[in-house]
Amino acid sequence: LNLYAAAQSRAEADWLVGINATRALTCKFNAQLSAGRVQTPTLALLVQREEEIRRFVPKDYYTVRADLGNFFVTWHNGKNQTAISDKEKADAIAEKIREKKFRITEVKKTFGSTPPPMLYDLTELQRDANKLYQYSPKQTLNIMQRLYETHKALTYPRTDSRYLTADLVPTLPERLRAVNHGEFGPIVGEIFRTRKSISHACVNNAKVTDHHAIIPTEEQVNLLSLNQEEKRIYTLVVKRFLTCFYPSYDFKKIRVELTAEGESFSAAGREIIELGWKKVEKGIEEDEEAAEQVLPNLRQGDSFVCKNIQLKAQKTAPPARYTEAT
């Protein structure tokens, strides 16, 4: 009932806003102008971001990084800000700690867990294809249509659901066998060998509208028959499907606080407990993990001597323009 009411509300909003406002703009300005429930606020966001970029004035700042042999630490102030706007202050901090002793004042470990990503609907697939391969939404849809209609490799593409219905669960072993080749073979082999079952989070009848999430069909595909574009999209969908049979990615986030000559420094790292679904798919957005280092076994009270200082000059950057993915 709620899904029906939501769809009806969107249709009425399209009529009230789209048709009437478009007609009003066209008559008012004697030009082919249009307005819409989605397009007009989206255009406003684009204009606002463009104005922010044009008004932006870059500023110089500096960071101080110390090499302690096995790991690096970064200076920060009392507000955990690492940027130093004054070059003389940055130089003074660098000289102050050169070859000095650093002492660990705190080691903080927090447990983290990331569940497998949800299955693809068309929008999310278009977003990832744009991030990874710069494909436009239309290009991704066309590729998906070929994989659905010509190759019979993937299910219906024009879906807005990221879930499966319970009646599909008995068909999953056959779908796994269909992708048991190429780079997917070892993963599928492990799923069958360890008798992994699909995550309950992927199955929800109430959240499936006309069509379920995009997954492989029960037809085995000759990968050599796919062109590069088709193989890329097919691989994205298959890997996302396979992640649903794996547990969460579990890890410990480690933050170390140190002092040297009255200045505060910190380092961040990550210790993997269970790789889980990341055995299959590394993830599209891993900037945070890439910035973290592998830390040695550290304890409060440990001391280290500064081996080297890195004083880095940087400039503040304007807000990024929106892409088709964002």
Regions found by a protein language model. Give the residues of each.
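Toprim catalytic domain recognition across nucleic-acid enzymes
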Residues: 1-326
